Amino acid sequence: MTVLLGVAHGSRDEAAQEVVRTLLDAAGERLGVLALPAYIDNASPSIALALEGLAIAGHDDVVVLPLLLNAAGHSKTDVAGSVQRARLDHPQLRLHYGRPFGAHPSVVTVLEQRLVEAGAADRPVVLVAGGSLDPDANATVAATARLLWEGRAHPTVDVAFVSATGPTVEEALLRAPDAVVSLLFLGPGYLPNKATTAAGDRIVSAPLGAAPELVDLIVERYREALGNDVRMNCDACL
């Protein structure tokens, strides 16, 4: 039986880990497979330990999915590198590597749901993400912002970042002082907390969380990977 290994960024916040477990439990039930978490940092198990455990347990077919919102260094280098090393260390494992969530309509739908829940369905928005030195990853955030604006009631949707690049949340809110803040993060943790602090007294919508739409997306990415139908811009991949 194929195993789904969902790789999240990792957080010391137990609530963030619970989001990952809930998503994977639901996706595993939908697919009829064992679905387990692994983390890049700040939580365990690591990708290497998780894959080693699966090999020792006798599993021979694993789909590794980055539960990440864009294709930054984590998915292109950290997770990809771990998969590459595991192929050498555990040649009995067939490893299929999927792509991250990206600027997918399911992500945009959940972002809008969180804004509606916050009473901000028709307000200007600053979409806040983690930020990366990889321009491809930052462009994905910009594409997500554009999709959030298209066909919806938000007058503007701008982007801001809490690490690695700009504009910062403070800079974006200077340009859009009446905007609400939308968190492009899977769950709670250090970076979303940093964004919330930077927002001051402005409305901040909740992170994506364990939304059913994201379960659908995990199932979609799993089937892509298992069918060797992964399509993404990999100019900067390992």
Describe every region a protein language model picked out.
Residues 1-238:
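Active-site-proximal alpha-helix that buttresses catalytic centers in soluble enzyme cores
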